[in-house]
Swiss-Prot record:
Upper classification of the organism: Eukaryota, Viridiplantae, Streptophyta, Embryophyta, Tracheophyta
Function: DNA-dependent RNA polymerase catalyzes the transcription of DNA into RNA using the four ribonucleoside triphosphates as substrates.
Subcellular location(s) of the protein: Plastid, Chloroplast
Residues that bind Mg(2+): D489, D491, D493
A Pfam family this chain is assigned to: RNA_pol_Rpb1_1
Catalytic activity of the protein: RNA(n) + a ribonucleoside 5'-triphosphate = RNA(n+1) + diphosphate
Keyword Metal-binding: yes
The keyword Disulfide bond is annotated on this UniProt entry: no
Binding site for Zn(2+): C69, C71, C87, C90
Xref: HAMAP family: RNApol_bact_RpoC1 (MF_01323)
UniProt-recorded name of the protein: DNA-directed RNA polymerase subunit beta'
UniProt xrefs under Gene3D superfamilies: 1.10.40.90, 2.40.40.20, RNA polymerase II, clamp domain, RNA polymerase Rpb1, domain 3
Subunit structure of this chain's protein: In plastids the minimal PEP RNA polymerase catalytic core is composed of four subunits: alpha, beta, beta', and beta''. When a (nuclear-encoded) sigma factor is associated with the core the holoenzyme is formed, which can initiate transcription.
Amino acid sequence: MIDRYKHQQLRIGSVSPQQISAWANKILPNGEMVGEVTKPYTFHYKTNKPEKDGLFCERISGPIKSGICACGNYRVIGDEKEDPKFCEQCGVEFVDSRIRRYQMGYIKLACPVTHVWYFKRLPSYIANLLDKPLKELESLVYCDFSFARPIVKKPTFLRLRGSFEYEIQSRKYSIPLFFTTQGFDTFRNREISTGASAIREQLADPDLRIITDHSLVEWKELGEEGSAGNEWEDRKIGRRKDFLVRRMELAKHFIRTNVEPERMVLCLLPVLPPELRPIIQIDGGKPMSSDINELYRRVIYRNNTLTDPLTTSRSTPGESVMCQEKLVQEAVDTLLDNGIRGQPMRNGHNKVYKSFSDVIEGKEGRFRETLLGKRVDYSGRSVIVVGPSLSLHRCGLPREIAIELFQTFVIRGLIRQHIASNIGIAKNKIREKEPIVWEILQEVMQGHPILLNRAPTLHRLGIQAFQPILAEGRAICLHPLVRKGFNADFDGDQMAVHVPLSLEAQAEARLLMFSHMNLLSPAIGDPISIPTQDMLIGLYVLTIGNRRGICANRYNPWNRRNYQNKTVYEYNNNYRYTKEKEPYFCSSYDALGAYRQKRINLDSPLWLRWRLDQRVIAPREVPIEVQYESLGTYHEIYGHYLLVRSVKKESLCIYIRTTVGHISFYREIEEAIQGFCRAYS
């Protein structure tokens, strides 16, 4: 359906019999109303045309060929001057044949039937609402159990039958004949109730607000009683309280949605449009029918068998009527959910029939196969690999996938820049992979986000937006921090790529779905982008440094002997480096350059010149050593920093004791903070 905001959506729920008949009924020009399927037939074996009032009737579902009725007459579709719109002979409407994809019919059931989804699925909504055991309700639905109605000031059928059976044993065999007359239904319907009609009566009687109030009162009373001291009794009370909560929620749902509970019992059974349950011919002209058709035929056969004794004047034993009602209930159960009551129904080849539940549920069902997970244009799929050099909001897209997804945009760019005169020439340039194609592709990708999805999509973070960049190879490169949101691993997992086309979709992707804007879990609010174990190990190795303290060379005899054979190196006139002595650097660039030239190790301690910052200097710390120079300046050496002072004891500069790993880590954090400030300034 389409709401007032023009959003297409699908709503599933229970409907009234009036709504079902309104979907199917049509009034012919002669005043006849069609829409009810009364015959279990499909196509005539001689003419190969749909049977009238059958499962494929053209009067009910529309013509097989657009504008052509069952008689072969033709009318122009949509021409208001053409009159009439229905064929006077066969009653088929002159419309497009696509109407057979959505025009429904219905079967008028001779007796009410409980909907097995509401009755047998756990938790059973009918059992919860009526507060009765499921086994007792099953006996009632399948006519194994009956209950008496309260009748006042009337001779009861039950009392009369009991007196005949127990007081006058000689007339025991003649009494069933009396009760099999046509008046049996009148007596029985007044005195006793069984089958789905009994369930329907019980669902229609109670007030939902009273059910909610009584359940709340009982729940409070059980809560006030406290523990009984017996573990079994405590569990029993806990289960009862949980049941009362479910019952109140169910009643409130019916009140909120304005749905009558008796709709869980069917009086009219909808019939799917013919195109959704087709009959096709395979090789050799052999017809192959959908399993739904066979299950519909079974329902119609049993329903007609029950309708005949109820509408004709011939006598039928009451037990036979109840047995036939049970067969109708079982046939509808098989149609809706085959096998829910035990052994599923099979065909002649010992193959289980596919019911409604089998058609719509599961990975190959109607929803996941054709509505939610169907193949769409502007999408691709590939394996994901880690891209540690990527930003959090970027992903690497293989060239092969990128050129296919953005091909229409690239073609438009080639034509706009007069590189190609038409679409054919543009496609040839793309096929030949000319350099200008990749340049235009990069321009297109800069302003167009993409969506990455990993199945199953269990929560909002299963689909996130990224800014694509071209990557070599055939795998999608992904930042490791976004892995947790997708619940993915880099061990062969695959992801789907989608391109949002409309401006609304692109704006939603940029404002709501970008990965760097989804850092917290929507469920509990905890950070979702946290370092993994391998990242923590890498950071540990990067920042562990050399465990030797500043006094290691001074007080270690072995190091003191090696210190006598030191060698001094000059590098860019900015620092002095010795094999044993810790080197001095004026900037982090010099330190990283020495590391790249393999003059120092990643964990080698060094002295790095730093800006004067009082937060680095400890006010009461005593220097380990003071070194004086010839010009009067001196160095105060502390545990983690070195302070250079002038003759007047003024601080000239400061060196901090660090490693190349610490420098690299600090620079990455500093660049990230600066980029964040620029983005939000």
